[in-house]
UniProtKB/Swiss-Prot annotation:
Family to which the UniProt record says this protein belongs: Belongs to the LppX/LprAFG lipoprotein family.
Gene that this polypeptide is encoded by: lppX
Gene3D superfamilies xrefs: 2.50.20.20
GO BP, sorted A to Z: lipid transport
Membrane topology: Lipid-anchor
Record's protein name: Putative phthiocerol dimycocerosate transporter LppX
UniProt keyword terms in alphabetical order: Cell membrane, Cell wall, Lipid transport, Lipoprotein, Membrane, Palmitate, Secreted, Signal, Transport
Length: 233
């Protein structure tokens, strides 16, 4: 893969991660199959209170107009193709993303999404790499999927106590994410994975952090500055 295609794919995946964190409905690359839908719709082993807490956090996240997102990885995450972390501001309706990432061990590489266009600044000028809809896989902009599939699909929920994340007291909850949801972040995923979410205790129901263990590595998304003004121009 040449450098241009490599950067394009990397930025695309980080953009999807940002979309997932914000809760935009049009950021999924796949739909669950019938078996997984049946399994995820009947989380018999989960505490109803935890299920309700996850659902409330989902609704709160979907209602955000903007958020700051930090994407971090550990280990080897092949799907990110050289991106190890990103620090971005995300605006919803319409989607706009602007920030920096560490690409191929080079920190501070700027990138942005404005409208449907992805641009990256490797040297002195912004270069348009194409559109999200052209570069992403089938159904990536399907309005019926997205963060709803990720969070509502989590089963086997277990409370793990409380934890302070970025000076915010949170409830820590673990669970299992079905394969179809994992594929949003790792298209090659072949099984369900463990996930952890941290939800603010202050009554806001904000999703402060979410982490998914992909086996060879993990992807962690941390949110802050909910609904605060962001500059994505």
């Amino acid at each position: 893969m040449n450098d241009r295609k490599w950067v394009t794919s990397s930025v695309m995946l980080v953009t999807l991660s940002a979309c997932l964190a914000l809760g935009l409905s049009g950021c999924s690359s796949t739909k669950p199959d019938a078996q997984e839908q049946s399994s995820s719709s009947s989380p018999a082993s989960s505490d109803p209170a935890l299920t309700a807490e996850i659902k409330q956090s989902l609704e709160t996240t979907k209602a955000l107009s903007s958020v700051h997102v930090v994407v971090q990885t550990t280990g080897k995450v092949d799907a990110l193709l050289g991106i190890s972390n990103a620090d971005v501001d995300v605006q919803a309706n319409p989607l706009a993303v602007k920030g920096t990432c560490t690409y191929n061990d080079q920190p501070g590489v700027p990138f942005r999404v404005l409208g449907d266009n992805i641009s990256v600044k490797l040297f002195d000028d912004w270069s348009n790499l194409g559109s999200i809809s052209d570069l992403s896989t089938s159904h990536v902009l399907d309005p019926n999927t997205g963060i709803t599939q990720v969070l509502s699909g989590v089963i086997n929920l277990q409370a793990q106590g409380t934890e302070v994340v970025d000076r915010i007291p949170t409830n820590k909850i673990t669970g299992t994410v079905p394969t179809s949801s994992v594929k949003m972040l790792d298209p090659k995923a072949k099984g369900s994975k463990l996930a952890t979410v941290w939800i603010a205790q202050d009554g806001s129901h904000h999703l402060v952090r979410a982490s998914i263990d992909l086996g060879s590595g993990s992807i962690q998304l941390t949110q802050s500055k909910w609904n605060e003004p962001v500059n994505t121009n």
